[in-house]
Amino acid sequence: MKRLITLCLLGACFLSAPAQNYVSQVWVADQGNGTYKNPVLYADYSDPDVCRVGDDYYLTSSSFNCLPGLQILHSKDLVNWTIIGAAVRYALPPVTDVRPEHGNRVWAPSIRHHNGEFYIFWGDPDQGVFMVKAKDPKGPWS
């Protein structure tokens, strides 16, 4: 019996050895030479919308029923993006039923900049059209 346990342990050690050498790769679109490869954003940013303010670009996309919602991303070159905040911290309108509503809530947003303020508009198929605004794209949004 001891011999069987020893063999099993040795086998487990040999099987796990290759996994210790594996290092996962992070997707990088920027090739470092002025070019890029698609996809620029290796994630699910459905219905993206971008606005330019000076030399800066701001992106938001559908977040559906996920919170915090309407992630705000920033870029200087449309290739390298960083998440800088979220425009929706709680369900709009407030809900008492917390079951997931896939395909509902926040989708197809539009981000704009006008007179020193950022605006995001989006439609909810059941509730209507909503808007949040902020002076700084990092927030706070109201």
Regions found by a protein language model. Give the residues of each.
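Carbohydrate-active catalytic/glycan-binding domains of CAZyme proteins
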Residues: 19-142
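Sec-dependent signal peptide recognition
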Residues: 2-7
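Hydrophobic h-region of N-terminal signal peptides that target proteins for export
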Residues: 10-18
